[in-house]
Protein backbone atom coordinates (compact mmCIF):
# COMPACT_ATOMS: atom_id res chain seq x y z
CA UNK A 1 0.00 0.00 0.00
CA UNK A 2 2.89 2.37 0.79
CA UNK A 3 4.33 1.91 -2.65
CA UNK A 4 0.99 2.68 -4.21
CA UNK A 5 0.60 5.91 -2.26
CA UNK A 6 4.10 7.07 -3.11
CA UNK A 7 3.63 6.66 -6.83
CA UNK A 8 2.99 9.46 -9.28
CA UNK A 9 1.11 8.01 -12.24
CA UNK A 10 0.85 9.54 -15.69
CA UNK A 11 -2.06 9.06 -18.12
CA UNK A 12 -2.05 5.47 -19.22
CA UNK A 13 -2.22 4.89 -22.99
CA UNK A 14 -3.53 1.41 -22.21
CA UNK A 15 -6.75 3.02 -21.01
CA UNK A 16 -7.61 3.76 -24.61
CA UNK A 17 -7.73 0.10 -25.47
CA UNK A 18 -8.36 -2.23 -22.58
CA UNK A 19 -8.21 -5.26 -24.84
CA UNK A 20 -4.46 -4.78 -25.31
CA UNK A 21 -2.51 -6.50 -22.48
CA UNK A 22 -0.23 -4.16 -20.52
CA UNK A 23 3.19 -5.61 -19.76
CA UNK A 24 5.71 -4.44 -17.19
CA UNK A 25 8.74 -3.06 -19.01
CA UNK A 26 11.06 -4.42 -16.31
CA UNK A 27 10.01 -8.03 -15.67
CA UNK A 28 7.22 -8.80 -18.12
CA UNK A 29 4.55 -9.24 -15.42
CA UNK A 30 1.09 -7.69 -15.85
CA UNK A 31 1.47 -3.91 -15.58
CA UNK A 32 -0.92 -1.78 -13.55
CA UNK A 33 -0.14 1.55 -15.18
CA UNK A 34 2.52 4.21 -15.64
CA UNK A 35 4.67 4.55 -12.54
CA UNK A 36 7.55 7.00 -12.29
CA UNK A 37 7.35 7.59 -16.06
CA UNK A 38 7.25 3.94 -17.20
CA UNK A 39 4.76 1.11 -17.60
CA UNK A 40 5.41 -1.32 -14.74
CA UNK A 41 3.85 -3.81 -12.38
CA UNK A 42 3.24 -3.06 -8.71
CA UNK A 43 6.29 -5.08 -7.65
CA UNK A 44 8.80 -3.22 -9.82
CA UNK A 45 7.21 0.11 -8.94
CA UNK A 46 7.77 -0.59 -5.23
CA UNK A 47 11.29 -1.92 -5.83
CA UNK A 48 12.33 1.24 -7.71
CA UNK A 49 10.84 3.55 -5.08
CA UNK A 50 12.56 1.75 -2.19
CA UNK A 51 15.89 1.61 -4.01
CA UNK A 52 15.87 5.33 -4.81
CA UNK A 53 14.82 6.40 -1.31
CA UNK A 54 17.56 4.25 0.26
CA UNK A 55 20.09 5.34 -2.37
CA UNK A 56 20.92 1.66 -2.64
CA UNK A 57 23.99 0.47 -4.52
CA UNK A 58 23.67 -3.03 -5.98
CA UNK A 59 26.31 -5.24 -7.57
CA UNK A 60 25.51 -7.96 -10.08
CA UNK A 61 26.99 -11.32 -8.98
CA UNK A 62 27.09 -12.39 -12.62
CA UNK A 63 28.14 -10.49 -15.76
CA UNK A 64 25.87 -7.44 -15.33
CA UNK A 65 23.53 -8.50 -18.10
CA UNK A 66 20.88 -10.60 -16.36
CA UNK A 67 17.55 -11.15 -18.11
CA UNK A 68 14.85 -10.03 -15.66
CA UNK A 69 11.60 -12.00 -15.58
CA UNK A 70 8.64 -12.28 -13.25
CA UNK A 71 10.15 -15.43 -11.73
CA UNK A 72 13.75 -14.28 -11.25
CA UNK A 73 13.37 -10.54 -10.65
CA UNK A 74 14.42 -10.98 -6.98
CA UNK A 75 17.67 -12.76 -7.91
CA UNK A 76 19.61 -9.74 -9.20
CA UNK A 77 18.65 -6.37 -7.81
CA UNK A 78 21.42 -4.58 -9.71
CA UNK A 79 20.20 -5.65 -13.14
CA UNK A 80 16.59 -5.11 -12.10
CA UNK A 81 17.36 -1.51 -11.09
CA UNK A 82 19.38 -0.99 -14.26
CA UNK A 83 16.39 -2.22 -16.25
CA UNK A 84 14.13 0.23 -14.40
CA UNK A 85 16.36 3.14 -15.42
CA UNK A 86 16.71 1.83 -18.98
CA UNK A 87 12.94 1.91 -19.58
CA UNK A 88 12.71 5.49 -18.31
CA UNK A 89 11.81 5.32 -14.62
CA UNK A 90 12.91 8.54 -12.91
CA UNK A 91 13.60 9.21 -9.24
CA UNK A 92 12.34 12.79 -9.68
CA UNK A 93 8.84 11.35 -9.87
CA UNK A 94 9.06 9.82 -6.39
CA UNK A 95 7.20 11.72 -3.69
CA UNK A 96 8.69 12.46 -0.30
CA UNK A 97 6.97 11.16 2.83
CA UNK A 98 5.51 14.64 3.40
CA UNK A 99 4.25 14.80 -0.17
CA UNK A 100 2.74 11.35 0.18
CA UNK A 101 0.89 12.44 3.31
CA UNK A 102 -0.38 15.62 1.65
CA UNK A 103 -1.53 13.61 -1.34
CA UNK A 104 -3.40 11.17 0.88
CA UNK A 105 -5.06 14.05 2.70
CA UNK A 106 -6.05 15.70 -0.58
CA UNK A 107 -7.54 12.46 -1.88
CA UNK A 108 -9.47 11.97 1.34
CA UNK A 109 -10.71 15.58 1.29
CA UNK A 110 -11.79 15.24 -2.34
CA UNK A 111 -13.72 12.08 -1.55
CA UNK A 112 -15.45 13.76 1.38
CA UNK A 113 -16.38 16.76 -0.78
CA UNK A 114 -17.77 14.51 -3.50
CA UNK A 115 -19.77 12.57 -0.94
CA UNK A 116 -21.18 15.83 0.45
CA UNK A 117 -22.05 17.10 -3.03
CA UNK A 118 -23.74 13.83 -3.84
CA UNK A 119 -25.79 13.98 -0.65
CA UNK A 120 -26.90 17.55 -1.42
CA UNK A 121 -27.55 16.92 -5.11
CA UNK A 122 -31.31 16.80 -5.80
CA UNK A 123 -32.73 13.46 -6.81
CA UNK A 124 -35.95 12.59 -8.53
CA UNK A 125 -38.35 11.00 -6.10
CA UNK A 126 -40.19 7.82 -7.03
CA UNK A 127 -43.34 9.88 -7.53
CA UNK A 128 -41.55 12.27 -9.87
CA UNK A 129 -40.05 9.42 -11.87
CA UNK A 130 -43.54 7.93 -12.11
CA UNK A 131 -44.98 11.24 -13.37
CA UNK A 132 -42.32 11.47 -16.07
CA UNK A 133 -42.88 7.85 -17.13
CA UNK A 134 -46.64 8.43 -17.43
CA UNK A 135 -46.19 11.60 -19.50
CA UNK A 136 -43.67 9.97 -21.82
CA UNK A 137 -46.07 7.08 -22.38
CA UNK A 138 -48.94 9.52 -22.96
CA UNK A 139 -46.92 11.42 -25.54
CA UNK A 140 -45.83 8.29 -27.37
CA UNK A 141 -49.45 7.12 -27.54
CA UNK A 142 -50.72 10.42 -28.92
CA UNK A 143 -47.92 11.55 -31.23
CA UNK A 144 -47.13 9.53 -34.34
CA UNK A 145 -43.71 10.54 -35.72
CA UNK A 146 -44.56 8.84 -39.04
CA UNK A 147 -47.54 11.19 -39.58
CA UNK A 148 -49.32 8.35 -41.39
CA UNK A 149 -52.78 9.71 -40.51
CA UNK A 150 -52.15 12.87 -42.52
CA UNK A 151 -53.15 10.93 -45.63
CA UNK A 152 -56.73 10.90 -44.34
CA UNK A 153 -57.00 14.70 -44.31
CA UNK A 154 -58.41 16.75 -47.14
CA UNK A 155 -55.42 17.11 -49.50
CA UNK A 156 -53.00 20.03 -49.28
CA UNK A 157 -53.42 22.43 -52.21
CA UNK A 158 -50.55 24.81 -52.89
CA UNK A 159 -50.66 28.01 -54.92
CA UNK A 160 -50.03 26.24 -58.22
CA UNK A 161 -53.06 24.07 -57.60
CA UNK A 162 -50.95 20.95 -57.22
CA UNK A 163 -51.40 18.43 -54.46
CA UNK A 164 -48.02 16.81 -54.86
CA UNK A 165 -48.43 13.08 -55.21
CA UNK A 166 -52.04 13.18 -54.08
CA UNK A 167 -54.15 10.27 -55.19
CA UNK A 168 -57.77 9.49 -54.23
CA UNK A 169 -57.90 8.56 -50.56
CA UNK A 170 -60.72 8.16 -48.07
CA UNK A 171 -62.18 11.66 -47.78
CA UNK A 172 -63.45 13.46 -44.74
CA UNK A 173 -67.03 14.72 -44.75
CA UNK A 174 -69.17 16.11 -42.00
CA UNK A 175 -71.74 13.71 -40.60
CA UNK A 176 -75.12 15.22 -40.03
CA UNK A 177 -75.60 18.92 -39.49
CA UNK A 178 -72.37 20.77 -38.69
CA UNK A 179 -74.35 23.18 -36.57
CA UNK A 180 -75.36 20.41 -34.17
CA UNK A 181 -74.29 20.67 -30.55
CA UNK A 182 -70.53 21.02 -30.74
CA UNK A 183 -70.31 20.91 -26.93
CA UNK A 184 -71.58 17.35 -27.09
CA UNK A 185 -68.96 16.63 -29.74
CA UNK A 186 -66.23 18.06 -27.54
CA UNK A 187 -67.37 16.19 -24.45
CA UNK A 188 -67.49 12.99 -26.50
CA UNK A 189 -63.93 13.65 -27.62
CA UNK A 190 -62.87 14.19 -24.01
CA UNK A 191 -64.40 10.89 -22.95
CA UNK A 192 -62.78 8.81 -25.69
CA UNK A 193 -60.27 6.39 -24.18
CA UNK A 194 -57.85 6.69 -27.07
CA UNK A 195 -58.88 9.47 -29.47
CA UNK A 196 -57.47 8.31 -32.76
CA UNK A 197 -59.74 10.05 -35.23
CA UNK A 198 -62.34 12.75 -35.58
CA UNK A 199 -65.30 12.10 -33.30
CA UNK A 200 -67.39 14.39 -35.46
CA UNK A 201 -66.26 13.14 -38.84
CA UNK A 202 -66.89 9.99 -40.81
CA UNK A 203 -64.42 8.28 -43.10
CA UNK A 204 -65.85 7.11 -46.37
CA UNK A 205 -64.23 5.69 -49.42
CA UNK A 206 -65.90 7.77 -52.12
CA UNK A 207 -64.59 7.73 -55.68
CA UNK A 208 -62.35 10.57 -56.80
CA UNK A 209 -65.13 12.13 -58.86
CA UNK A 210 -67.17 12.79 -55.71
CA UNK A 211 -67.76 16.54 -55.19
CA UNK A 212 -66.11 16.31 -51.75
CA UNK A 213 -62.66 15.91 -53.34
CA UNK A 214 -62.96 18.97 -55.55
CA UNK A 215 -59.68 20.81 -55.09
CA UNK A 216 -59.88 24.23 -53.49
CA UNK A 217 -57.98 26.74 -55.63
CA UNK A 218 -59.07 29.78 -53.64
CA UNK A 219 -56.54 32.11 -51.96
CA UNK A 220 -57.02 30.03 -48.78
CA UNK A 221 -56.45 26.73 -50.55
CA UNK A 222 -54.57 25.20 -47.60
CA UNK A 223 -57.36 25.92 -45.11
CA UNK A 224 -59.26 22.61 -45.50
CA UNK A 225 -56.11 20.50 -45.09
CA UNK A 226 -54.71 22.46 -42.15
CA UNK A 227 -58.15 22.60 -40.52
CA UNK A 228 -58.20 18.80 -40.59
CA UNK A 229 -54.64 18.72 -39.25
CA UNK A 230 -55.54 21.03 -36.36
CA UNK A 231 -58.72 19.06 -35.61
CA UNK A 232 -56.67 15.85 -35.54
CA UNK A 233 -54.09 17.53 -33.30
CA UNK A 234 -56.78 18.68 -30.87
CA UNK A 235 -57.88 15.06 -30.50
CA UNK A 236 -54.31 14.06 -29.69
CA UNK A 237 -53.92 16.88 -27.17
CA UNK A 238 -57.11 15.69 -25.46
CA UNK A 239 -55.70 12.16 -25.31
CA UNK A 240 -52.44 13.42 -23.83
CA UNK A 241 -54.17 15.66 -21.28
CA UNK A 242 -56.35 12.86 -19.95
CA UNK A 243 -53.22 10.96 -18.94
CA UNK A 244 -51.64 13.84 -17.01
CA UNK A 245 -51.49 12.72 -13.36
CA UNK A 246 -54.27 14.55 -11.52
CA UNK A 247 -56.08 15.87 -14.59
CA UNK A 248 -58.94 13.40 -14.16
CA UNK A 249 -59.43 14.68 -10.61
CA UNK A 250 -60.72 17.95 -12.03
CA UNK A 251 -64.37 18.51 -12.86
CA UNK A 252 -65.41 18.00 -16.47
CA UNK A 253 -66.05 21.73 -16.76
CA UNK A 254 -62.51 22.59 -15.65
CA UNK A 255 -61.04 19.93 -17.94
CA UNK A 256 -62.86 21.45 -20.90
CA UNK A 257 -61.88 25.01 -19.96
CA UNK A 258 -58.21 24.04 -19.67
CA UNK A 259 -58.21 22.16 -22.96
CA UNK A 260 -60.04 24.84 -24.93
CA UNK A 261 -57.73 27.58 -23.71
CA UNK A 262 -54.47 25.63 -24.13
CA UNK A 263 -55.14 23.52 -27.23
CA UNK A 264 -53.45 25.78 -29.79
CA UNK A 265 -50.50 26.37 -27.44
CA UNK A 266 -49.88 22.66 -26.98
CA UNK A 267 -50.24 22.09 -30.73
CA UNK A 268 -47.53 24.72 -31.27
CA UNK A 269 -45.35 23.03 -28.64
CA UNK A 270 -45.81 19.57 -30.15
CA UNK A 271 -45.13 20.84 -33.66
CA UNK A 272 -41.60 21.76 -32.59
CA UNK A 273 -40.68 18.10 -33.01
CA UNK A 274 -41.23 18.38 -36.76
CA UNK A 275 -39.84 21.92 -37.09
CA UNK A 276 -36.52 22.20 -38.90
CA UNK A 277 -34.32 25.30 -38.77
CA UNK A 278 -32.68 24.39 -42.09
CA UNK A 279 -35.53 25.98 -44.04
CA UNK A 280 -37.89 27.12 -41.27
CA UNK A 281 -40.55 24.55 -42.07
CA UNK A 282 -42.47 21.73 -40.41
CA UNK A 283 -41.41 18.46 -42.02
CA UNK A 284 -44.07 15.81 -41.45
CA UNK A 285 -42.69 12.89 -43.40
CA UNK A 286 -42.99 13.79 -47.08
CA UNK A 287 -42.96 16.75 -49.45
CA UNK A 288 -46.77 16.82 -49.46
CA UNK A 289 -46.73 17.30 -45.70
CA UNK A 290 -43.85 19.75 -45.44
CA UNK A 291 -45.33 23.08 -44.38
CA UNK A 292 -43.72 26.49 -44.73
CA UNK A 293 -44.73 30.09 -44.13
CA UNK A 294 -46.62 30.25 -47.43
CA UNK A 295 -48.73 27.23 -46.51
CA UNK A 296 -49.71 28.78 -43.18
CA UNK A 297 -50.59 32.06 -44.90
CA UNK A 298 -52.79 30.15 -47.36
CA UNK A 299 -54.78 28.90 -44.38
CA UNK A 300 -55.73 32.47 -43.52
CA UNK A 301 -52.98 33.55 -41.13
CA UNK A 302 -50.91 36.70 -41.50
CA UNK A 303 -47.33 37.61 -40.64
CA UNK A 304 -48.52 39.07 -37.32
CA UNK A 305 -48.90 35.44 -36.21
CA UNK A 306 -46.46 33.65 -38.50
CA UNK A 307 -43.34 35.70 -37.71
CA UNK A 308 -43.53 35.33 -33.90
CA UNK A 309 -44.51 31.68 -34.37
CA UNK A 310 -41.34 30.99 -36.36
CA UNK A 311 -39.29 32.93 -33.79
CA UNK A 312 -40.87 30.83 -31.04
CA UNK A 313 -40.12 27.57 -32.84
CA UNK A 314 -36.48 28.53 -33.40
CA UNK A 315 -36.04 29.61 -29.78
CA UNK A 316 -37.61 26.42 -28.46
CA UNK A 317 -35.50 24.28 -30.78
CA UNK A 318 -32.32 25.95 -29.55
CA UNK A 319 -33.09 24.93 -25.96
CA UNK A 320 -32.38 21.32 -27.00
CA UNK A 321 -34.94 20.00 -24.54
CA UNK A 322 -34.89 16.39 -23.46
CA UNK A 323 -38.07 14.53 -24.30
CA UNK A 324 -38.82 14.40 -20.56
CA UNK A 325 -38.63 18.19 -20.37
CA UNK A 326 -40.77 18.56 -23.49
CA UNK A 327 -43.65 16.45 -22.13
CA UNK A 328 -43.50 18.16 -18.73
CA UNK A 329 -43.69 21.56 -20.42
CA UNK A 330 -46.78 20.48 -22.39
CA UNK A 331 -48.45 19.22 -19.22
CA UNK A 332 -47.64 22.45 -17.34
CA UNK A 333 -49.05 24.43 -20.26
CA UNK A 334 -52.35 22.54 -20.11
CA UNK A 335 -52.77 22.63 -16.33
CA UNK A 336 -52.64 26.40 -15.79
CA UNK A 337 -54.78 27.78 -12.93
CA UNK A 338 -54.97 31.29 -14.43
CA UNK A 339 -57.01 30.25 -17.47
CA UNK A 340 -60.29 32.23 -17.68
CA UNK A 341 -63.23 30.19 -16.46
CA UNK A 342 -61.36 27.78 -14.18
CA UNK A 343 -63.48 27.04 -11.11
CA UNK A 344 -61.19 25.05 -8.81
CA UNK A 345 -58.02 27.07 -9.31
CA UNK A 346 -56.41 25.70 -6.12
CA UNK A 347 -56.60 22.10 -7.32
CA UNK A 348 -55.33 23.06 -10.77
CA UNK A 349 -52.46 24.97 -9.16
CA UNK A 350 -51.57 21.99 -6.95
CA UNK A 351 -51.38 19.73 -10.00
CA UNK A 352 -49.27 22.27 -11.89
CA UNK A 353 -46.93 22.78 -8.91
CA UNK A 354 -46.26 19.06 -8.79
CA UNK A 355 -45.39 19.10 -12.49
CA UNK A 356 -43.24 22.24 -12.15
CA UNK A 357 -41.29 20.80 -9.21
CA UNK A 358 -40.69 17.63 -11.19
CA UNK A 359 -39.38 19.65 -14.14
CA UNK A 360 -37.03 21.73 -11.97
CA UNK A 361 -35.68 18.63 -10.23
CA UNK A 362 -35.21 16.84 -13.54
CA UNK A 363 -33.22 19.76 -14.95
CA UNK A 364 -30.92 19.86 -11.89
CA UNK A 365 -30.45 16.09 -11.90
CA UNK A 366 -30.33 15.10 -15.54
CA UNK A 367 -29.58 18.11 -17.75
CA UNK A 368 -25.84 18.82 -17.70
CA UNK A 369 -24.43 22.36 -18.04
CA UNK A 370 -24.11 24.57 -19.93
CA UNK A 371 -27.50 23.64 -21.41
CA UNK A 372 -29.16 23.63 -18.01
CA UNK A 373 -28.17 27.24 -17.21
CA UNK A 374 -31.43 29.09 -16.43
CA UNK A 375 -33.23 26.46 -18.50
CA UNK A 376 -36.33 26.38 -16.30
CA UNK A 377 -36.71 30.16 -16.54
CA UNK A 378 -36.30 30.00 -20.31
CA UNK A 379 -38.96 27.28 -20.55
CA UNK A 380 -41.42 29.31 -18.47
CA UNK A 381 -40.75 32.28 -20.77
CA UNK A 382 -41.76 30.06 -23.68
CA UNK A 383 -45.12 29.54 -21.98
CA UNK A 384 -45.51 33.32 -21.81
CA UNK A 385 -44.66 33.54 -25.51
CA UNK A 386 -47.34 30.96 -26.21
CA UNK A 387 -49.95 33.11 -24.46
CA UNK A 388 -49.16 35.95 -26.88
CA UNK A 389 -49.32 33.59 -29.85
CA UNK A 390 -52.62 32.22 -28.57
CA UNK A 391 -54.05 35.73 -28.36
CA UNK A 392 -52.98 36.58 -31.90
CA UNK A 393 -54.27 33.24 -33.19
CA UNK A 394 -57.66 33.88 -31.58
CA UNK A 395 -57.81 37.31 -33.16
CA UNK A 396 -57.02 35.98 -36.63
CA UNK A 397 -59.29 32.97 -36.18
CA UNK A 398 -62.25 35.21 -35.32
CA UNK A 399 -61.64 37.24 -38.45
CA UNK A 400 -61.36 34.07 -40.52
CA UNK A 401 -64.34 32.21 -39.13
CA UNK A 402 -66.62 35.26 -39.41
CA UNK A 403 -66.75 34.60 -43.15
CA UNK A 404 -69.19 31.74 -43.94
CA UNK A 405 -67.18 30.57 -46.97
CA UNK A 406 -64.21 29.98 -44.64
CA UNK A 407 -66.13 28.76 -41.61
CA UNK A 408 -67.71 25.94 -43.61
CA UNK A 409 -64.23 24.55 -44.34
CA UNK A 410 -63.49 24.13 -40.64
CA UNK A 411 -64.44 21.06 -38.61
CA UNK A 412 -67.04 21.13 -35.83
CA UNK A 413 -64.35 20.34 -33.27
CA UNK A 414 -62.23 23.30 -34.43
CA UNK A 415 -65.31 25.54 -34.33
CA UNK A 416 -66.11 24.35 -30.80
CA UNK A 417 -62.60 24.70 -29.39
CA UNK A 418 -61.69 28.02 -31.00
CA UNK A 419 -65.21 29.45 -31.15
CA UNK A 420 -67.83 29.80 -33.87
CA UNK A 421 -68.41 33.36 -35.01
CA UNK A 422 -71.29 32.31 -37.26
CA UNK A 423 -74.60 32.07 -35.40
Curated annotation (Swiss-Prot):
Key words, A-Z: Cytoplasm, DNA-binding, Metal-binding, Nucleus, Receptor, Transcription, Transcription regulation, Ubl conjugation, Zinc, Zinc-finger
Protein name as catalogued: Vitamin D3 receptor
Region (Disordered): 159-180
Domain NR LBD: 127-419
Assembly description: Homodimer in the absence of bound vitamin D3. Heterodimer with RXRA after vitamin D3 binding. Interacts with MED1 and NCOA6. Interacts with MED1, NCOA1, NCOA2, NCOA3 and NCOA6 coactivators, leading to a strong increase of transcription of target genes. Interacts with the corepressor NCOR1. Interacts with SNW1. Interacts with IRX4, the interaction does not affect its transactivation activity. Interacts with CRY1. Interacts with CRY2 in a ligand-dependent manner.
Residues given in the record as calcitriol binding sites: 143, 233, 270, 274, 301, 393
Similarity section: Belongs to the nuclear hormone receptor family. NR1 subfamily.
Function: Nuclear receptor for calcitriol, the active form of vitamin D3 which mediates the action of this vitamin on cells. Enters the nucleus upon vitamin D3 binding where it forms heterodimers with the retinoid X receptor/RXR. The VDR-RXR heterodimers bind to specific response elements on DNA and activate the transcription of vitamin D3-responsive target genes. Plays a central role in calcium homeostasis. Also functions as a receptor for the secondary bile acid lithocholic acid (LCA) and its metabolites.
Annotated GO CC locations: caveola; chromatin; dense fibrillar component; euchromatin; heterochromatin; nuclear matrix; nucleus; perinuclear region of cytoplasm
Chain intervals with Low complexity compositional bias: 171-180
Zinc finger motifs (NR C4-type), residue ranges: 24-44, 60-84
Interaction with coactivator LXXLL motif, as annotated region: 242-260
Post-translational modification summary for this protein: Ubiquitinated by UBR5, leading to its degradation: UBR5 specifically recognizes and binds ligand-bound VDR when it is not associated with coactivators (NCOAs). In presence of NCOAs, the UBR5-degron is not accessible, preventing its ubiquitination and degradation.
DNA-binding region ranges: 24-89
Record text about domains: Composed of three domains: a modulating N-terminal domain, a DNA-binding domain and a C-terminal ligand-binding domain.
GO molecular function, one term: calcitriol binding
Chief location bin: nucleus
